[in-house]
């Protein structure tokens, strides 16, 4: 949201739900997302990768059991895309969250534990990735 700084953007869902923002959770996410030194910046003062990390922070603020990520790296270069993917994987492991990600990027999809490919509205492939 363009008129809100990083902290305000990340805590918006908690505040809209009428709950108190957990300062410890906020600080943990700011550190995890490498946004501690940018917490008072507005979106137009952030890079595309930083803006995407703010969005991830907003999604993680409520500690959901399932994170839905629709093209989370769609507008990012390959370096920032990989950074975002690493953050999502870390969140998956650290907080035991299920990550459902929609992507057209085969390289990102191959980093998943399971791939379900959909073609013409039907499941074309469903496979568990063994490492």
Residue ranges and their predicted role:
Residues 1-118:
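ABC family nucleotide-binding domain
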Residues 122-131:
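Conserved beta-strand-loop-alpha-helix hinge in the C-terminal portion
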């Amino acid at each position: 949201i363009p008129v809100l700084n990083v902290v305000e953007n990340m805590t918006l869902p908690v505040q809209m739900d009428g709950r108190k923002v957990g300062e410890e959770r906020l600080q943990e996410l700011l550190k995890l997302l490498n946004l501690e030194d940018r917490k008072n910046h507005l979106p137009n003062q952030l890079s595309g990768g930083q803006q995407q990390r703010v969005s991830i922070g907003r999604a993680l603020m409520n500690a959901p059991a399932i994170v839905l990520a629709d093209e989370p790296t769609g507008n990012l270069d390959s370096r920032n895309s990989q950074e975002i993917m690493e953050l999502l994987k870390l969140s998956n492991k650290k907080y035991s969250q299920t990550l459902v990600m929609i992507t057209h990027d085969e390289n990102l999809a191959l980093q998943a534990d399971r791939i379900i490919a959909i073609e013409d509205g039907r499941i074309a492939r469903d496979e568990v990735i063994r490492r």
